[in-house]
Amino acid sequence: MNWHPRARKLNFGAYPNLNPMAKVKVLVQGYTNADSKEVIGHEKTCPTITLVVDKGIVMVVDPGALDNQKILVDALAREGYLVDDVNIVCITHSHAHHYMNVGMFQKAKVLEYFGLWTGGMVQDWQENFSDDIQILKTPGHDYSGISLFVKTHEGVVAICGDVFWNEDGPEFDMYASDQKVLKHSRQLVTQMSHWIIPGHGGMYKTKQLSSIPPSGAAKSEASVAGSCKKCHRLFKKITDKCICQDWLCYHCCECEADCKVCNCKVRR
């Protein structure tokens, strides 16, 4: 099955089915002309709609605002799913054009910044949503921004809403609630992923990814104290701050205990 939005065949068949990993598919590739200088009161925009399948999870991320909902119904059908097969709808942030079709999915729970909703009841979501899906808060474009980091056989795919609009920018987000916070979220998404699915474009390969050198690789001249278990950023000093958990030092994110080096506390 082709899970890459640019029609490049990804070879999942080379891996044993005994330990399947999550799969990601762009159902509807989004677009926007909001960053065009020619746009004067006639903005055209559609969010990217993504399918995530992980064992018992069938999730649609940002069901969007389509002129015709049949577009989404047909896209799901091509992957072998009915609307009622979807059991979770994820909303990456609070801008309405990303979630107006949420009512299509009557049997699904809704996952968003404040929790996982079942009807009128809400429960906190866990950062490690499943073995292969991690959820982190990524504000800046909007205070309620969250991103999914999905482990697949092709690497980690970040589904990040409008943290990035598309591969080509814009660097300055005219709608961002906080440019400085957005910059931090962009660094986080870039460092934690091999692929990015932006809010209004197709999947693209991450330009930069910090990772642990493979065993036997030549050692860097700079000393390394260790690395973060989440984003694999390398630390030169044990008091370095992690870009994905900047309130913790290396010891905290490594051992997940109260830190005696910097006196910070692990989030419980």
Segments from the language model and where they lie:
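Cys/His-rich microdomains that often coordinate metals
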Residues: 235, 248-259, 266
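Core dinuclear metal-dependent hydrolase active-site scaffold
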Residues: 19, 26-30, 42-44, 49-53, ...
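Short Cys/His-rich metal-coordination motifs, predominantly Zn2+-binding knuckles/fingers
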Residues: 153, 231-234, 245-247
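Metallo-beta-lactamase
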Residues: 143-227
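Active-site HxH/HxHxD metal-binding segment of metal-dependent hydrolases
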Residues: 40-41, 45-46, 63-131
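Zn-dependent metallo-beta-lactamase
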Residues: 1-56, 190-192, 207-221
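Cys/His-enriched microdomains
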Residues: 226, 240-250, 257
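Active-site neighborhood of phospho(di)ester-bond hydrolases with catalytic His/Asp-centered motifs
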Residues: 61-63, 85-95, 101, 111-114, ...
